[in-house]
């Protein structure tokens, strides 16, 4: 599960 998916910019 992607935990830092919000940092995938």
Curated annotation (Swiss-Prot):
Disulfide bonds: none annotated. Belongs to the FARP (FMRFamide related peptide) family. One of its GO terms (cellular component) is extracellular region. It comes from Sarcophaga bullata (Grey flesh fly). The keyword Coiled coil does not apply. It is found in: Secreted. The modification Phenylalanine amide is found at residue 9. GO terms for biological process: neuropeptide signaling pathway. Keywords: Amidation, Neuropeptide, Secreted. This is FMRFamide-6. The keyword Secreted applies. Its main location: secreted. Coiled coil: none annotated.
């Amino acid at each position: 599960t992607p935990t830092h998916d919000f940092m995938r910019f």
